């Protein structure tokens, strides 16, 4: 409480942080940004549609490498929700899978 008027958080691990987010959201307005905790009591999520962003990256890669080739994917934090969603979108696009 105190002088805090609100909280904006980029969630590292929604499964482990949702309880804390819900506790804080009971006292002040709380939003998530960049990486979400969709099952929390946050007011809203502000950020990229991460799965679609991954698909768009896949389209650019296919356009820039029309003959195919080798590709290395680096993900900073593989278990973070936004990373998972972006990676899934990229891999689905590269494999020509239908969008989710």
What positions do the PLM features span?
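A residue-level marker of the well-folded mature domains of exported/periplasmic proteins
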Residues: 1-100
């Amino acid at each position: 409480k105190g002088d805090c008027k609100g909280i904006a958080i980029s969630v590292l691990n929604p499964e482990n942080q949702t309880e804390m987010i819900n506790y804080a959201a009971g006292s002040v307005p709380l939003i998530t940004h960049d990486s979400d905790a969709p099952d929390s009591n946050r007011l809203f999520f502000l950020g990229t549609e991460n799965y679609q962003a991954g698909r768009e990256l896949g389209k650019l890669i296919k356009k820039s490498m029309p003959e195919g080739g080798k590709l290395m994917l680096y993900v900073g934090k593989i278990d973070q929700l936004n990373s998972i969603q972006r990676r899934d979108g990229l891999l689905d696009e590269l494999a020509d899978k239908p969008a989710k």
